[in-house]
Structure formats: C-alpha cells, structure tokens
C-alpha cells in the first residue's frame, strides 16, 4: 500500500480563489474589503517570514492589510493599548498577534485582550469555549485547516479512533475538540502519556504536532490509517521535515499529508476564511 498524498497547497489555493471571488462580490455590492491588522513584536526571522507571507496573501486576494511592527523592547502595556485601539477601530475586522511574543510579555493576557469577534486566530477563550460547546464561531486556524483538508478529500472520519500526539493550546487541544465535533472518538497524548506506541498503533486517524523531526516511526502507523503531520522541522542540512517518518509512513497509511505542502498552507487559508467571516459578523452587528 502506498498512501494517497493530501495536497494542502492545492486545497489552500482553491480556498484563496473562493475568498478572492467573495471579496470582489462584496466590493461590487458597495461593501468594504475585509481588513486584517497583523502585529509583529521583535525581529525573530521565522516570525517575520510568516508575517510577510500572511500579508502578501491578504493583499493578493483583495484584503486590506495593516502592518504593526513593534520593537523587541515594547512593553506589555503598550501592546495591550494597541490592541484596544484596534478593537475599537470599526474599519478593522481581524487582529492577528504573531506568536511567540518576547520574554516578559504574557501571551495569554495579550490574546485575551483581543475582541472575540476580531480574534481571527481563534485563540480567545470565548472562541475556544464556543468550539467546546459545539457552537464554533472563529476557529483555531490549523485544526480547522485539517478538518477542511479531510472534507475536501471526501474522507469520512465519523466514528474513527483519532489520536492526537501533542497537547498544545494552539494545535493539540483544539484539534481534539474539532475531531470530537466531527464525530471521532478522540485520544490526546502528551508528555505524561504511557505506551505512546500502543495509542498510535490503534489510531485510524493520527494527527501529530510535537515539533520533533521523525518523532513517530512509520512502523507505528496502523495499516490504512489517515496520517496528518502538522510538524515543521528544519534539519541541519536545510531540509524541512515533519514529525512523522514520511518515507516509512507512506508505505502503511491510506492518506498522508506531506511536509512541506500539507497542513502548513491550510493555516493561512483558514486565517483568510476567518477574516472574511469576521467581516461579515461586523456588518451584521
């Protein structure tokens, strides 16, 4: 068995085209284009790369992109004041704070400061709570992007045993909630989990997000499983790989996402979907 590749680049491009069309329809109807404010604190090269990609994507589909590049020594109070200004700016539909933030700034407090209806990353406790209550509004981008990939490939996951390896607030925990909402029986593993191999071997659907290259050997993959690799790891030789041993896993899985080109593009695609959704909420309110 050789797994079918789940092409995140292709699906992400489809979504961008769909959103661009909807934006043009809004503009023709006399409505404003969606506006996303992206806040970058400091000079982390990876964060700068991600922010540049997000801004270019927004502009390419007709969004208004506002850039706020703050110095590394900005205080938490100053950052919170900027968020308050963006919250009350009626022309701004979405606010994105690029993570991680510098040492000394409380990530949770900053994310909680964003108005829930402008929280296009889906990290605010209100939006996470709505997801837990089976009434999602703005959903965390990477987990929602995974669900979209499965939907676009017509992969039925209802009733499957889903195992999420990694329990981060950004990916693992909301991923578990998304899979539960989709009808899976969900296990979330973490650093205290015993017998990780046994859990992985029982997974009909495996989602891995730990940030460790090749962490899951292909021999652990259940034959015919669906493998979603969210990890992005850069090796010393410059090669980018995921958390799953791809060359081994592809021989056992039924479907698998590559790294790069799998889940990564879907995160940005979901961000623009969320921003358009936030824009629609603003018009209705």
UniProtKB/Swiss-Prot annotation:
Cross-referenced CDD domains: NAD_bind_m-THF_DH_Cyclohyd
Pathway recorded for this protein: One-carbon metabolism; tetrahydrofolate interconversion
Residues at which NADP(+) binds: 166-168, 232
Domain of life: Bacteria
Catalyzed reaction equations: (6R)-5,10-methylene-5,6,7,8-tetrahydrofolate + NADP(+) = (6R)-5,10-methenyltetrahydrofolate + NADPH; (6R)-5,10-methenyltetrahydrofolate + H2O = (6R)-10-formyltetrahydrofolate + H(+)
Keyword Amino-acid biosynthesis (UniProt): yes
Annotated keywords: Amino-acid biosynthesis, Histidine biosynthesis, Hydrolase, Methionine biosynthesis, Multifunctional enzyme, NADP, One-carbon metabolism, Oxidoreductase, Purine biosynthesis
An annotated GO cellular component: cytosol
GO molecular function: methenyltetrahydrofolate cyclohydrolase activity; methylenetetrahydrofolate dehydrogenase (NADP+) activity
EC numbers, comma separated: 1.5.1.5, 3.5.4.9
The UniProt record lists the keyword Hydrolase: yes
Purpose: Catalyzes the oxidation of 5,10-methylenetetrahydrofolate to 5,10-methenyltetrahydrofolate and then the hydrolysis of 5,10-methenyltetrahydrofolate to 10-formyltetrahydrofolate.
Protein family (similarity comment): Belongs to the tetrahydrofolate dehydrogenase/cyclohydrolase family.
Subunit structure and binding partners: Homodimer.
Protein's name according to its UniProt entry: Bifunctional protein FolD
Organism: Baumannia cicadellinicola subsp. Homalodisca coagulata
């Amino acid at each position: 068995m050789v797994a079918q590749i789940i092409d995140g680049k292709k699906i992400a491009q489809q979504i961008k085209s769909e959103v661009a069309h909807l934006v043009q329809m809004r503009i023709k109807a006399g409505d404003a284009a969606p506006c996303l404010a992206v806040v970058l604190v400091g000079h982390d090269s990876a964060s700068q790369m991600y922010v540049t990609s997000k801004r270019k994507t927004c502009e390419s589909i007709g969004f208004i992109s506002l850039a706020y590049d703050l110095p590394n020594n900005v205080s938490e109070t100053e950052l919170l004041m900027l968020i308050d200004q963006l919250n009350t700016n009626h022309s701004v539909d979405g606010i994105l704070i690029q993570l991680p933030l510098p040492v000394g700034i409380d990530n949770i407090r900053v994310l909680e400061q964003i108005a829930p209806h402008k929280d296009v990353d889906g990290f605010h406790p209100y939006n996470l709570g709505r997801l837990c209550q089976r009434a999602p509004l703005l959903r965390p981008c990477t987990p929602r992007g995974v669900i979209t990939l499965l939907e676009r490939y017509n992969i039925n996951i209802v009733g499957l045993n889903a195992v999420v390896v990694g329990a981060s607030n950004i990916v693992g925990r909301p991923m578990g909630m998304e899979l539960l909402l989709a009808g899976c029986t969900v296990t979330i593993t973490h650093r205290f989990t015993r017998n990780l191999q046994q859990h992985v071997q029982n997974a009909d659907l495996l989602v891995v997000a730990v940030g460790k290259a090749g962490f899951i050997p292909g021999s652990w993959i259940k034959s015919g499983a669906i493998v979603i690799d969210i990890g992005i790891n850069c090796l010393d030789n410059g090669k980018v790989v995921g958390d799953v041993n791809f060359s081994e896993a592809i021989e056992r899985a039924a479907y698998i996402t590559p790294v790069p080109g799998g889940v990564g593009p879907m995160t940005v695609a979901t961000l623009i979907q969320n921003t358009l959704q936030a824009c629609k909420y603003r018009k209705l309110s």
